[in-house]
Amino acid sequence: MSTRPDLRNVAIVAHVDHGKTTLVDAMLWQSGAFSERDTVEKTGERVMDSGDLEREKGITILAKNTAVHYTGPAAQDLGLQDGVTINVIDTPGHADFGGEVERGLSMVDGVVLMVDASEGPLPQTRFVLRKALQAHLPVIVVVNKVDRPDSRIDEVVSETTDLLLSLGEDLMNEGIDIDVDSLMDVPVVYASAKAGKCSLDNPGDGQLPTEDLEPLFETILNRIPGPSFDEDMPLQAHVTNLDASPFLGRLALLRIHNGTLKKGADVGLARHDGTIQRVHISELLATEGLERVSTDSAAPGDIVAVAGIEDIMIGESLVDLEDPRPLPLITVDDPAISMTIGINTSPMAGRVKGAKVTPRQVKDRLDRELIGNVSLKVLPTERPDAWEVQGRGELALAILVEQMRREGFELTVGKPQVVTKEIDGVLSEPMERMTIDIPEEYLGAITQLMAARKGRMETMANHGSGWIRLEFVVPARGLIGFRTRFLTETRGTGIASSISEGYAPWQGTIEQRLTGSLVADRAGQATPYAMTNLQERGSFIVEPSSEVYEGQVVGENPRGEDMDVNICREKKQTNTRSATADVYESLTPSRKLTLEESLEFAANDECVEVTPEAVRVRKVVLDAQERFKIAARERRANR
């Protein structure tokens, strides 16, 4: 086997919000990828998060790659005068985007694991690290944010070592061969990505490291091997991601394992069904910094994009036509959460100019999403204008709906459900392992909240700083609508994150929402006068003088049953007074629900109407008489 000394492929993995994308920024700046003239807008902060939604929410959704060209002292020591190209893959930290993580890891030879110096390793860290160890990738630990005033560096390093060893033990029990000595000897780099500084020595809690990112580059070069390949093997390249370019059409991102790829060549495409198809490579692009530049040929270990293959799919391989040897397909965790997405069926449908409202447009958009999103499944339902979309978690699905909303779609979205399975004849549901950090005084409230959702406490640790860390195993459907209740109970201070734990037998019924809904009983405009008289009955989620229709949920009833209300009632006026003057002072402001909150808020007989201009919660059956008949039938059936 030969290796390439002038190339390193690295994935940066961490829990959400521990600073992966910020570190990539600092690496690009210090290796000179941006010229002095570049504006902040062009480079900005978190260059890798290029989507609007990613910038707003501050999370990475798609795994992306960039190339850092490094020519510093560490490269000179290894005798590489021209420097080293480090291909960096920035992976998402959310387990909901697990499909992205697995694809990212199939492209690299080593992993940089980032851990927050105060929070320590969290569930998503465990998730990604397990995947990396399964693939036998060397690990470098970066303790980030060491300059936080509440950092506890030594504890976090020992927690991370414990995590590595316990994962190694788990995998050995499953029959996977792990080198435990190498896990004991994992290098640790102390860093502050935002300041762009790091060192190999512990700077002390809350202190800034002294050097720039040189020690990190040095550790990457020394610890992570160059890509290895077999000189006698024919071409083998794995498609790990898809992209589109307005000029070149569909692009496939490849990692070349063996052989060379040339622009204009004819190669074989090994399909999912085992057939080999002859394809022509019309354009070959390599990454430099954040730009893609055209190149004539690519060697083993390179991560490149090819154009000219229209229907190429993720997980397929490019092979030699004379001697085809396809690579194994990429496997992704099964989806755990599903929801129905269909066209907007409410009386307000089609009011927005230029909105996309036909079933055909929705179906085409969902099919387009399937191309690049490996962890998604779309299944037909009994209605021709709605589809069941399955994904890893409700965040991934809510982000798909939000993207469609911004593209001008009008949709009806059902409440998220779990995807159940029959295992050995027993109905089973997906479970999640949840880690919760809360101040001590909320311990009782949170234990009660989790018990109501069939959560089982596994461990409880007191950090001694007034904070407690709890670990629960809980059914995935217990976490639908959990976040809002959790933040209310802990007054916004709690931190909760979860990760898939496989399947377990069905846990029984879970009470989702203890309150009922206030439902509009006629169409019209919500009047401040009616809302003032109704506000002691509950809280509202619509604004005064907004339009409502029959069957729309306009508020929350503190009692457990639904109540039909007339929110359009007008005040009988004497001829001189203004209609609204004396009402607005006494009206409590309405709650504004975002898309995710609406999905959590909706009861089982409700769905969410999503248009480019508004998000509304409504009953599935709009007519009050019909709803009454259905409820009576259910009561009779339960007797």
Predicted regions located by residue number:
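Structural and coupling elements of P-loop NTPases
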Residues: 1-639
